[in-house]
Amino acid sequence: MDTILNRILTHKRVEVERQRIKIPDAQIRARAEAAPPPRDFAAALRAHRPIALIAEVKKASPSKGVLIENFDPLALAHTYASNGASAISVLTDVRFFQGSLKHLEGIRAMVDRGAVPPLPLLRKDFIIDPYQVAEARAYGADALLLIVAALDDETLAALLALTHSFGMQALVEVHNEDELRRALDAGASIIGVNNRDLHSFTTTLETTRRLAALLPSSNRPLLVSESGIFTAEHVALVRSWGADAILVGEALVTAPDISSKVRELGGGS
């Protein structure tokens, strides 16, 4: 089936091989192993109650095109960190989201020199290859996104284990009951429920309600609600369903006053 996700993954395989030629596996792994210790992504989410905000540095999307003109990833991250975000998600997909690893690297440098609070950084991309895991750590990620719909069980388990071996954590993204079961079977401790169907790109917050009810009560993973969250009412809704955190991009970058929107969605004043 020719879906948006399948088109993205087809291109991603080519992109990874091109990147591997530029910076070979051994070199990117050495850079990853030499990177400063990662910050604790899960702890940052748990520390912020009643709900944590993962604020996303996002220029564009496949469905809506460019979302913010005069895009400045460092200024955006600074605004997020200064207004109460718990973590920062950085889109690094070039072709479909107009992101870049350079954005991640630049934001990490800004955090490390103390220009903003020391928030953990999440690499948001379509990660399908071990190379990208090492690459995430090399460029400063503390955590990364693994999309269950893009991976078979063996690859999901291998990428999750490799992520942990670098000291990073994984936000394991699901959209339906089968994907949630697969994520739990793989040992995911942070589950991201994407309210957007990556095949059709339609969105409903009901996805969070439906899947939150299926989480185990013992050793319950952290639950992050992703996509379709635009108002404080939306935040209250997903929180009432058991979300520990929200991941928001579009609502922030399209807001007339980004600082105020961060405080609104993050529960600040």
Curated annotation (Swiss-Prot):
InterPro entries: Aldolase_TIM, Indole-3-glycerol_P_synth, Indole-3-glycerol_P_synth_dom, Indole-3-GlycerolPSynthase_CS, RibuloseP-bd_barrel. It is an enzyme of class 4 (lyase). Its EC number is 4.1.1.48. Keywords: Amino-acid biosynthesis, Aromatic amino acid biosynthesis, Decarboxylase, Lyase, Tryptophan biosynthesis. It catalyses: 1-(2-carboxyphenylamino)-1-deoxy-D-ribulose 5-phosphate + H(+) = (1S,2R)-1-C-(indol-3-yl)glycerol 3-phosphate + CO2 + H2O. One of its GO terms (biological process) is L-tryptophan biosynthetic process. GO terms for molecular function: indole-3-glycerol-phosphate synthase activity; phosphoribosylanthranilate isomerase activity. Transmembrane segments: none annotated. The keyword Lyase applies. The keyword Lyase applies. Pathway: Amino-acid biosynthesis; L-tryptophan biosynthesis; L-tryptophan from chorismate: step 4/5. Belongs to the TrpC family. PANTHER family: INDOLE-3-GLYCEROL-PHOSPHATE SYNTHASE (PTHR22854:SF2), TRYPTOPHAN BIOSYNTHESIS PROTEIN (PTHR22854). HAMAP family: IGPS_B. NCBIfam families: PRK00278.2-4 (NF001377). This is Indole-3-glycerol phosphate synthase. The gene is trpC.
